[in-house]
A protein has these predicted regions:
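Electrostatic, structured charged patches in enzyme active sites and in nucleic-acid/phosphate-binding
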Residues: 1-145
Length: 145
């Protein structure tokens, strides 16, 4: 069951949502967490991890000034039944900051697959999710008609 915490909206109208005492940045992210729990219970995946963190650029010092590392915290890491691991980020839209972090991630971690997914009741799978780029393609085609 989804418990909405104090209605805190960010600039993209996402509402923080709490499930199992875990606060998610958006309702869609919380719903995907529930989907992953269901997939694990059904034996469709082996396991999953919340918010895996990746260092995109190490911290450094220059001219006596310290610069912090640039980090990327994904939404989930999924482990399949054949021990293949991939990263999932639930996105409604891609911000400029995320596009840069995605580019840095793909450069630094070329062997780790990053899947972007969106929620779409109309076009999504049984859990209501679809590949972000596939949804963009469908929407573009539908605008053309």
């Amino acid at each position: 069951m989804i418990n909405k915490s104090t209605t805190v909206k960010n600039k993209y109208n996402n509402k923080k949502t709490t499930i199992d005492d875990i606060v998610f940045d958006s309702k869609d992210e919380a719903l995907y967490y529930q989907a992953l729990k269901d997939m694990k219970a059904k034996g469709l995946i082996k396991d999953f991890e919340l918010q895996p963190e990746f260092i995109l650029q190490e911290g450094f010092e220059k001219d006596e000034k310290k610069y912090r590392a640039i980090k990327y915290t994904a939404d989930f890491r999924v482990l399949t039944n054949n021990d293949y691991s991939y990263i999932v980020d639930v996105k409604g839209m891609l911000t400029t900051e995320f596009k840069i972090k995605m580019k840095l991630f793909n450069y630094k971690y070329p062997d780790i697959e990053l899947k972007l997914i969106s929620r779409s009741i109309k076009f999504g799978d049984e859990y209501g999710f679809i590949d972000y780029y596939e949804l963009q393609k469908i929407r573009k085609q539908n605008r053309g008609n």
